[in-house]
Amino acid sequence: MAASRSAGEAGPGGSQGRVVRMKRRGGRGPRRGPAGGGEKALKRLKLAVEEFVHATSEGEAPGGCEGRGAPVSFRPGGRKSRKELRKEKRHLRKARRLQRTAGPEQGPGLGGRSGAEEASGHRQDTEERARPAPSRDPSPPRKPRPSRVKAKATAATAKTRPSAAATAAARKRALLAANEEEDREIRKLERCLGLNKRKKKDGSSSVPLSFARDGLDYILGALESGKNSGLYDSSGEEEEDAGQTLPESDLESDSQDESEEEEEGDVEKEKKAQEAEAQSEDDDEDTEEEQGEEKEKGAQEKRRGKRVRFAEDEEKSENSSEDGDITDKSLCGSGEKYIPPHVRQAEETVDFKKKEELERLKKHVKGLLNRLSEPNMASISGQLEELYMAHSRKDMNDTLTSALMGACVTASAMPSRLMMEHVLLVSILHHTVGIEVGAHFLEAVVRKFDAIYKYGSEGKECDNLFTVIAHLYNFHVVQSLLIFDILKKLIGTFTEKDIELILLMLKNVGFSLRKDDALSLKELITEAQTKASGAGSEFQDQTRIRFMLETMLALKNNDMRKIPGYDPEPVEKLRKLQRALVRNAGSGSETQLRVSWDSVLSAEQTGRWWIVGSAWSGAPMIDNSHHTHLQKQLVGTVSSKILELARKQRMNTDIRRNIFCTIMTSEDFLDAFEKLLKLGLKDQQEREIIHVLMDCCLQEKTYNPFYAFLASKFCEYERRFQMTFQFSIWDKFRDLENLPATNFSNLVHLVAHLLKTKSLSLSILKVVEFSELDKPRVRFLRKVLSILLMETEVEDLSLIFTRVSDNPKLGVLREGLKLFISHFLLKNAQAHRSADEANVLREKADLATKCLQGKASLRM
């Protein structure tokens, strides 16, 4: 025990402390006085240190001495160089290492006993307090005499020097143990860094270049989560473990690096680092002593078991690392994208600038609307067009719509003239800028009206919105379909508020509706009369219902005087201004929105199909859903015979089948006309009505005038149907020689009927080359003109032929008709007809010829 205590005093806490004090006080000894006593003491100390160093270099531990023969603290008289201090430190570490490795083999000898006692004294403080055990932070020892230090060092050297063979065997075992410890440490570090799967070609592990380049090859272990993170709690333990197991060359290089780092600090920091190192070495000596006491065979089995456990730990670490990767990927996938601060700041700057720009735009537009009037309509509309060119369409549409809604939709009733001027501005921009302007404003107005109508309002917002919709129709932004949809919904509910709104709408657009679609207005009036007669007893005040019915009757009879307060002059005046401003607009003539009430309200689900290029997603196409609905309705209501007949007639699309079944199941041509319009077809789909109608007419075995009257109704309804019929008839003209007899005869009667009813003009014959007529075309023209002349009244006949007399482009047609009438129609008239019929034909042919020559010849 005395030997171990002396070893503890000569360890890092004792000898190194004395070295530090030598560095502090070494230069002060020779200066104490002129006497030579200090120099003699210094020489004796040097001799004692040299003997002690020689003894430790031969393999003896300073703590292995019996008694207290180890060198104790002394006060040197001179300063040693740094090289000598590093050399002494290396020798001390080697001696302690040899003592630990050789201790188990010596059994209960002196050296092993001292190491074991020192370890047990470190673990059990209570047993060792009776003895002066080595402290981790030793206090400055008492000054011994130089002669006593020298004697104790000599005695320790003589008593504890081991043999050369034992020293070599102990050194070999220490190297093997150090190699195994180093392998375990490397595997431990690899598991902690997650690098156990990365292997070089020679089998050794490697750190990724990115880790080494960024300095993460060392600090990455401290960031790892899990139980392995505790392996790197103390950098001192890391260094001490490496110092215990590395070879001598590595140990020397490490000690040199440490000494170089110590040179940079002051002496106090050096002392604290050495004391901490000594403390960690004492802790590790306990583990090494316990492992050294086991037998070689048991140690090998234990190593095998550890290898197995290491393999299991590697698998667990691999699984945990894979789970961590999956978790990190899921977090990265579900989390938001990281935005760097400079990008975030740039976005905030852009948003702030955008907000300021929108505020300026809003003020500018609002200022223009505040100055709006009829005289400056042209200048304000021009400035708004420039704003549309300078800003995005979306920003301008939103800003203009919000400004107009704020100006027109108020709690009090707006003046009619002011309302019309604002809507006229929208109409001008709708025609000059694009239809999305009017479409955006219309959608906002309809949605606002629907919300206020459902939830009610005490003010006049609902009336103002209804007036805006009426004037949008007056100034040709929307067609009559939207107005009729609204009126039908109001008649369906038929409350006092509904009656008031119906009267307001009829007062503003009643006669325009009658002009555009008299049939729909007639049906609406009939439905309103039926509803009023059924719900008359529910209203206490019958005067409002009576006034509404009188207004509808006045519209039906086209009597403006019976509508109180009706003045069409302001609307007509603003319409003239509109025509003057949009005359040179390049947006085309078909700018009116043919959209229904339900389509506007369901625009978010079905898309804004009335705006060219509008984006939409999330629901099936509107046409497909509409066709599916029609197909379901068709299967449920139409017999299988009609469907089979449609298949035979080559109605190969849903639209054609629906049109065919509608025509076949109608009561008369008026019923068919109404049902076909209610199909809600658009553009190309509407043309299919004419194509199906022509096919059905020509496929009849005998001529059926039902198709001719239905065709006349469509031609009177809108001009686009006239153009479709004209092109369809021209297609048949080119293929006359291939038509069967029944188809040929039905086509003759259809064309003659359309000419007699003035649904089509004689200009449809302008494609006929009268100079190159073949037999089918001569026969076709002879029959058509004979029916036209014989079955038409004189007044109607003169109008039919006069329509083509004043057009200079139809000169060839006029000359060809006169030549055909004189040579092909009248030449053999008496041979095929009776005398009376021939005379009537000749008289009407002369009248037709005079009409073709012009109005002057007709007067003569």
Curated annotation (Swiss-Prot):
One BP annotation, GO: ribosomal small subunit biogenesis
Main location: nucleus
Effect of substituting residue 308 to A: Loss of interaction with PPP1CA and loss of ability to relocalize PPP1CA to the nucleolus
Residue intervals of the MIF4G domain: 362-559
Top-rank taxon, per record: Eukaryota
Residue ranges, annotated region (Disordered): 1-172, 191-211, 226-339
Tissue localization of expression: Expressed in heart and skeletal muscle.
Transmembrane portions of the chain: none
Basic and acidic residues bias (residue ranges): 115-131
InterPro entries from the UniProt entry: ARM-type_fold (IPR016024), CWC22_splicing_factor (IPR050781), Initiation_fac_eIF4g_MI (IPR003891), MIF4G-like_typ-3 (IPR003890)
Biased composition (Basic residues): 20-31, 77-99, 142-151
GO cellular component: nucleolus
Skewed-composition ranges (Acidic residues): 249-267, 278-293, 312-325
Result of altering residue 310 to A: Loss of interaction with PPP1CA and loss of ability to relocalize PPP1CA to the nucleolus
Keyword Phosphoprotein set for record: yes
Modified residues (Phosphoserine): 57, 139, 317, 320-321
Motif position, Required for efficient binding to PPP1CA and for targeting PPP1CA to the nucleolus: 307-310
Keywords annotated in UniProt: Nucleus, Phosphoprotein
PANTHER family: CELL CYCLE CONTROL PROTEIN CWF22-RELATED, NUCLEOLAR MIF4G DOMAIN-CONTAINING PROTEIN 1
Subunit structure: May interact with EIF4A1, EIF4A2 and EIF4A3. Interacts with PPP1CA and PPP1CC.
Protein name (record): Nucleolar MIF4G domain-containing protein 1
Provenance organism: Homo sapiens (Human)
Gene expressing this chain: NOM1
